[in-house]
A protein has these predicted regions:
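A generic "binding-loop/recognition-motif" signal
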Residues: 58, 67-68, 86, 102-103, ...
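Glycine- and acidic-residue-biased ligand/ion/polar-headgroup-sensing regions
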Residues: 67-79, 84, 93
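Conserved short histidine dyad/triad with adjacent acidic residue
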Residues: 35-36, 50-65
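A contiguous, mid-protein "functional segment" used to position or interact
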Residues: 112-160
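A short, N-terminal "cap"/entry segment at the start of jelly-roll beta-barrel domains
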Residues: 1-47, 141-175
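Short acidic-glycine-tyrosine-enriched beta hairpin
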Residues: 85-103
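Short beta-strand His + acidic residue motifs that chelate non-heme Fe in jelly-roll/DSBH
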Residues: 62, 81-82, 98, 104-110, ...
Length: 175
C-alpha cells in the first residue's frame, strides 16, 4: 500500500512486503552474499530481512548493535555464536534472538558455507552491507574474500549504523 492521500500517515498494518524467491537485490560484501528480502525502506523502518551466505571459517569481531535487536535462523551449515558470555554451537534449523546491546560474535565452522535468515528489528542495519559491497553479479559467494578495504569501510560506517566493535573474533580453537 503505497498510495496514501496527502497528509495521511501509515501504520504497521499498512505495510505488506512480498518477494518471490531470488527476486530481491543481492549484494557481495565482506566475502558474503546478502539477498535482500525486505529493507527498512520497504517496511517503514520496522524490519530488515536478508538471506546471508557466509563461507567456511569466516568470523566477525565481538560487537554490539545499539539500535536494533537481531535474530537469525540457520538454514544450512554450522557456526559458533558468542552471545554475551555464552558460546552456542548452531546447526541448520537453530534460531537465536539477541536484544540490542548484547555483545556477540560468530564464526562459520565446518566445510560448507552457512546460509541464514537475518532479521533486524527495527530495520536499517543490513543497509551497511549495501554501502560496503557491490551488486552481486550472481547469487553465489563472491570470488574474493574479505579485503582490508572492506573492513576499513565497514568500520568507518559502523557508528552511523549503531555498530560498535568491543573485542576480537571467536578464536578458531574455541569454535
Amino acid at each position: 500500500m503505497t498510495n496514501l492521500p496527502a497528509g495521511a500517515s501509515r501504520s504497521a498494518t499498512d505495510v505488506v512486503v512480498s518477494r518471490a524467491a531470488g527476486t530481491g537485490p543481492a549484494t557481495w560484501a565482506m566475502g558474503m552474499l546478502f539477498e535482500r528480502l525486505a529493507g527498512a525502506g520497504e517496511t517503514d523502518g520496522l524490519l530488515g530481512a536478508s538471506v546471508v551466505t557466509q563461507p567456511p571459517g569466516q568470523a566477525s569481531p565481538l560487537h554490539v548493535h545499539t539500535l536494533e535487536a537481531e535474530a537469525w535462523f540457520l538454514l544450512q551449515g554450522a557456526m559458533t555464536y558468542r552471545a554475551g558470555e555464552r558460546l552456542i554451537r548452531m546447526t541448520a534449523g537453530d534460531f537465536i534472538y539477541l536484544p540490542q546491546e548484547v555483545p556477540h560474535a560468530f564464526r562459520t565452522t565446518g566445510t560448507v558455507p552457512v546460509r541464514f535468515l537475518a532479521l533486524t528489528l527495527p530495520g536499517g542495519l543490513l543497509d551497511i552491507y549495501d554501502e560496503v559491497g557491490v551488486p552481486a553479479a550472481e547469487r553465489r559467494l563472491p570470488d574474493a574474500g574479505v579485503s582490508d578495504a572492506d573492513v576499513a569501510r565497514w568500520l568507518e560506517l559502523a557508528p552511523r549504523y549503531g555498530l560498535r566493535v568491543v573485542g576480537p573474533p571467536i578464536p578458531e580453537a574455541e569454535a
